[in-house]
């Protein structure tokens, strides 16, 4: 009987060993017994072995068994390092070989489970500490986010530590271990942050505290971070904090107005981030055929039309639209003179009253509410009428007819179609119907952008066309390259450096006002469109696609066309001449973009009498607190402004007005694209290539 019992125990041991082996292979770990529940089967096997020995001994000696002895076995089983059976006195061990095998397997199994458990505890404790230390030493992102958002973010940027305010439960810890998520627990107060990060302050590495989704303590976090920066004099810690769509702009303006801390605090909104990435990757020129452009002049041909259709106009689409109206400024020619080339926008919205803010005119009402007479102001910018807003459902007859009427089969028109209706299914369905209509009517000049939240390959399989682009998924938004975006900030700093080189007084990047920094960011975003107008493009640097000859070719071309710093004043007045070159066209395009940027941010014209010339390097021409700027005018108005500054400077310096017309830098900033192109090198994140 005891031999049979021993064989049963061996069978159970083999099953348990097989289970542990299977789990080790599945998890690809030898030290797999981090789960305390693995103790139960090993203890039960030991209990069966000791109980079998107890019964055998009692039968052999004729002693009466009592319940206490069976209870005492539990204590013996838990003390796996000191087996209570004396090998010399164990009758069953001495007489039954099968039981002996079962016993030694059971003891070794229990010891193995216990030892590997201890190894796991030590391993995970020190491994986590080592990983945290290694990540912190190299500079990293410190993430405050929900588990799903954290998983998405850390998957795209492993050099991230999750910051928790409360200790996670055992189940959550297990999930973190399985996903390789590194975390620490820190209270959100300045003393706790100082204690945790004091060793890494100003160590030459950057640390980004990223808070995804607005929370009850978000504003408190901003205040705590300010105190942290002030107490530590830190210049390498940055806070990136998300605010809801409706709260974002007003809070961002207040936070950014604090010049002491605004260089270190970035308020963001996911829709704004998507919009920036969208216009950076897909300017309105991106997919337009080469025959629409005159690359030698960097213009769109006068007889060509570019249309952008927004199918669905919620938060996502309206934010992209606003960014596009800033970025997608184009130029053409009329009688050998430069003029703006308007992109035609058609907005289809089936939920017209859901959010009133999205229905507002692109240009802020404040700008057009005033009467700008010529005596008090420079020439105001004329309002564009190239936006057509429709409140309709394109699934219904009237809406469908209007939508389809814009999708013309005309070789001189190109259609960018952006579909952001709502659910992924609805967006894909609308795209399928749109593609079918375009094919039926032989429309070739188009590109469709479909927003997919889920990034499902199954949805993408519905389309085999090169004229389809998907955007807007979670990993599209929740990642380091979008929220922190060092490449874009580096390009913005390049733009600012070029601007500052043309000034007599250099302003440190961190001391710039928030609007000027943001202006440089959008100037950096616009580089791809400018390159498209020249016949070039930007792509990711894979380490092998950099072509120095292309950069040299562009620098040589634009260098010959760009007036030198000490050039006569008249060399910049291309808008009064009978001809122009590509550098002139890009300068004019930059002026249009700059105007659009400041208009979108609520600025209006400053009165002529409010402009003050203090000295050659100190001119009061704007007021960020009132959102006023003297240069928010036409190119003709800018020339009048330039003349006024030269006259005022001439009174101060006693130099001829002709000399001060050269010294005043009004026009030179718009030619900065050449200086930015010069910075592209073999190790740049992006490289310039010729358009295919």
What is each PLM-predicted segment?
Residues 2-46, 55-75, 85-107, 111-593, ...:
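Cytosolic regulatory regions of ion transport systems
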Residues 606-607:
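Aliphatic-rich, non-membrane protein domains
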Residues 613-621:
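An amphipathic alpha-helical core segment
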